[in-house]
Structures are given as structure tokens and as C-alpha cells.
Amino acid sequence: MPPTISDDTTVRSFTCAQPLGRAGYELIIRQMLHRFLSDLHTTKALLDRSLQATVNHAAGPVRSLLTIITVGFYTLLNWCSLGSYHTTKMISTVVTGLLLLASGCEALPTNQTPLPGKWSTLPNITLNGVEYPRQEHAAALVGDEIFVLGGILPWDGKEYATTNIVQKYNMITGTWTETAPMPAALNHANVAVVDGKIYYLGGLEAVDETYWNATGKSAVYDPATDEWTVLPSMPEGREIGSAATVVVDDTIYLPGGLAYTNITYDQEGTVSRFSSYNVRTQEWTTLPDLPAPRDHAGKGIYRDMLYILGGREFGNKNVVSTVFGFNLTSQQWATAFEPMPIARGGVASATIGSLIFTAGGEGDRRTPTAVFPEMQAYDAATNTWVDYADMPLPVHGSDAVVYKGEIVIPGGGIVTGATLTPVVQTFQPPLPDSGEKSMPLMVMVYRVVFDLPWMLFKR
């Protein structure tokens, strides 16, 4: 059915109440073109939101015209459902794209101040020159190269296949290349970088088409030789995927995560267990459990505190806003932190200075896509949250790295569950007082003024 034309929807990510801008709509249109030839149901959901944004924004004769076109479009879409529909789908997509770009939805309401920060894109994830959507993968930065590891592939009519493929994007040359595959095919892998080497310590592997189980399989990758070395598995009973993985010196911390995921019955085994692995000694340590089970949470380190932000508890509908902190010195958990402004799970998180950024995520009940557009940061120095510009293309199930002060988020899902995109989005946070200065300079000044004295005092 067509959307209710008179309904001023509250969906932020696909309405002009929170405009996406021309770049955002171009991303949506590109995604619609990609999805049309493989998944009509998902495409209809995307176009529902996009068309509703167009119609809600228009007025007078333009509104009437768009209403007629909308009804006509849905008639075409219904015809599409009856048989062979490739040509009709493509025509419908082009018409929708023209409507979106011509409707003026990119203009901000006169009473709204743009949120800070600048979004952009890098070349889409590709494999042998072909776009290669990815979700529930891990990302890692080594030097000038961003690695995308494992994850799931688009629906093939039977399952979301888990892959061991690894690709890297060179920020200098602007090219994607394939590297040596992971020894195990994993999604929700727990990945960290220590001394220029990439570690994965467990993750989820497919048992059958719709059931993923945690595994303790582990390995380390050396970019210099393009070789993987298999490591001893995680201790029995400590296997997890989707942990809030962070690194401090030689130690990789893995708080929370998933023991399993049953896609058919929407069941997830969220855990509160907490382990760490020292890459020098190759020893595992059991740490105090989290205050509550968490998976798909944001994470970050500031000074001697490990933060767990939001996430979910036993299912993607059960998102939470709590912020936990683990003191690495006292080895104790604390919970008295300002919660997330919006409960979210499946966010991509990255830390710059005292700011822990959380982008996207799923569990948004304001929209049928259930994917959040918000970019918000927790300031660990002040225990406050800061709002930034929304994502042009809201995603969940992705990961993030920081390259020279810019946050890079490759791929992810654009509809709750699994609807993959190859789009790579980047976010440049502004300086509080001047958007003209570079982020790396701000970080350097901040660390000299605040962090260096603290580090010297700690020693």
C-alpha cells in the first residue's frame, strides 16, 4: 500500500524534518538501484520512506502532482510483484530518484541549525572491481590502509553466507585490493590491532543457514607478509562474538558479546562475561563480569577507563542506553555515567581524544527500517553527550576506524536485520571553536595540555 500522504511521519532518517541533503538522497538512490534487481521487499521499504519524504515536503499543486505520481508508482510496484519486472523496477527507480532530487528536501527548515560535522564518502567496497556489500564485519587500520574482515554477504535465496574474505582500502592510492583470507569464516569477529598486526579472537560462525554460534578460533595477520598465523583458541566456555573489543598496550579486552544468534526465531544469547588476552605472553585472563549482559555495544578507552555504551540485551529490539565503565587500575565496574540520549545497538564507534563517537545502529522504532541516523559522542572528560550531523545513509552492523582525525565507516546494513551496503562513509568532526582547523592538530593540543600531565603523574 502507498504511504499515508497526509501523515507527517516522525521518521528522522527519511523525512525532511531531518533532511538528508542531496548527498544522502544520492546514496539512497544508489542503494535502491543496487537492491532493485535482488530484493523487491527491501526496495519497497526504502522507497516507502523516500517517497513519503518527498510528498510530505511538497505543497500545493506540487503536492497533488507528487500524490498522483506516488499512487502510479505503487501501481507499477504492485505489477512488479506479479511476474518478470526488471524493466519496470528500473523505470520506477529512476522516476523516484528524479523526484527526490527535484523536491527540495535537501533544504533545512528555517528554524533549524545544522548540527556540526561533515560527512563524505570513499569509493565503495569492491572485490575484483565489483561492488561487494558487507555487514557484521570488522574494520582495522594499519598505517594508511583500512581492512574489512569477514562478515556476511547478501542473501542468496537461502542464507546470509558468512565469509572469510579480507579486503583493504589504501587511503593514499584510493584503491581496494583483496588480501589473504582469514583462516576461519566469521561474522561479528572480535578484532584488534596491536603493533601493526591484526588479531581476531573469536566471533560467530555459521552452523546452518540461520544459526550462528560463538567460536574461540583465533589468529593474527601480518600486513607486511600478507600471512595469517593461527593462535590457540579462546579458553573453553569463554567463546564470544560481537564483544566490545578494545586495546590497551599489549592487552586486548573483550567485554560482553554473543554466545549465539538464531535468526529464524530472533533469539540471541547475550553474555556478561569479560576476558582479556595479552599478545606478548599469549595468556588469557578472566575479569569481573559486566553489570548486565551486553552485545553490539559501542566502546572506547579514555585514560584508565574502558567504556561500554548502549548495545542490546537478548535481541535487536531490546536496545539499551546505559553506559558502563571498567576501571583498568582498580579492576572494578561503575555505572554512574550519563546514558545515551537515544538507546541504540549495533553502532559503529570510534574514539578521538575524550570523545567516543557512536554512529547509526538499529532498534529505531520511529521508522520501519529501524536504523538510526544519529551520530553522537560521549565526552568522557565531562560525562556529557554531544550531537553531531546525522549519517547521510543510516547503517548498523558496521565498524569504524579513525584515520588522521577522520572517522571511516565501511559498509553495514541499511534495514534492521541484514540488508547490506558497499557504501563507505566518512565523518570529519569539527573543532569546538573553529571548523577551519584540522582535527589532528586539535587532538595533539588536547593531549599535550590534558593527557600528557596525567600520564606523567600516573607513572
Curated annotation (Swiss-Prot):
Kelch repeats lie at residues 92-144, 145-196, 198-248, 251-304, 306-354, 355-405. The keyword Repeat applies. SMART domains: Kelch (SM00612). Pathway: Secondary metabolite biosynthesis. Disruption phenotype: Impairs the production of terrein. Induction: Expression is under the control of the terrein cluster-specific transcription factor terR. Terrein shows anticancer activity on various tumors including cervical carcinoma, ovarian cancer, and head and neck cancer. The secondary metabolite acts as angiogenesis inhibitors through the inhibition of angiogenin secretion. Terrein also has anti-inflammatory activity. It shows an alleviative function of age-related inflammation characterized as an anti-oxidant and might therefore be a useful nutraceutical compound for anti-aging. Terrein may enhance osseointegration by decreasing the level of ROS and has a potentially synergistic effect on osteoblast differentiation. Signal peptide: none annotated. It comes from the Eukaryota. Gene3D superfamilies: Kelch-type beta propeller (2.120.10.80). Keywords: Kelch repeat, Repeat. Kelch-like protein; part of the gene cluster that mediates the biosynthesis of terrein, a fungal metabolite with ecological, antimicrobial, antiproliferative, and antioxidative activities. The first step in the pathway is performed by the polyketide synthase terA that produces 4-hydroxy-6-methylpyranon (4-HMP), orsellinic acid (OA), and 2,3-dehydro-6-hydroxymellein (2,3-dehydro-6-HM) by condensing acetyl-CoA with two, three, or four malonyl-CoA units, respectively. 4-HMP and OA are not pathway intermediates, but are rather shunt or side products. This is Kelch-like protein terF. It comes from Aspergillus terreus (strain NIH 2624 / FGSC A1156).
